[in-house]
Regions:
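Rossmann-fold NAD(P)-binding glycine/threonine-rich loop
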Residues: 1-47
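Active-site-lining helix/loop region of Rossmann-like oxidoreductase modules
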Residues: 50-153
Length: 153
């Protein structure tokens, strides 16, 4: 509701990636949606560097996904296979892997921890929290809010 009106198919559970693919009439690979802009701009690292973060890619064509996963690697992130487009809900806003600046192992675990149907409520709670802060949150504060939504200590 932050930007777009409701779309019936999405409200009924269709993944955004499948909906977009159907609308444009072409297959897609979903990637880079689960990292913040500052992460993309500032946190890419060489392969093997300590602290290298990960980004997930989901899609139905293994060949196309392999190309995108190479791009993720070239951008300075460890690529993680996020499954098919049907499974791409696991990297939507409000899921455990979304905008948390995780390394490869943490990203793989977070993708598996996603619970069907839970993300919209978590996403809305995160957005509500961030919109009611006294000042714009820093990159690190956004990461902490996203992580905290799933890992209460």
């Amino acid at each position: 509701d932050l930007r777009d009106s409701h779309i019936k198919e999405l409200d009924e559970g269709k993944t955004e990636s499948l909906w977009v693919s159907g609308k444009i009439g072409h297959p897609i690979i979903k990637a880079f949606n689960n990292v913040l802009g500052d992460t993309l701009a500032e946190k890419g690292r060489k392969k093997g560097d300590e602290g290298r973060l990960a980004a997930a890619a989901a899609g139905d064509s293994a060949e196309d996904k392999a190309v995108v996963m190479r791009l993720i690697d070239e951008a300075g992130f460890d690529p993680v296979d996020g499954g098919t487009l049907e499974e791409s809900w696991r990297q939507q806003p409000g899921t455990p892997c979304y905008c948390c600046d995780y390394n490869k192992e943490e990203m793989e675990k977070a993708l598996q921890e996603a619970v069907p149907g839970k993300a919209p409520g978590v996403r809305d709670a995160i957005n509500d929290h961030l919109m009611h802060l006294a000042k714009a949150p820093t990159h690190e504060e956004i990461i902490q809010v996203n992580r905290g939504a799933h890992h209460k200590e």
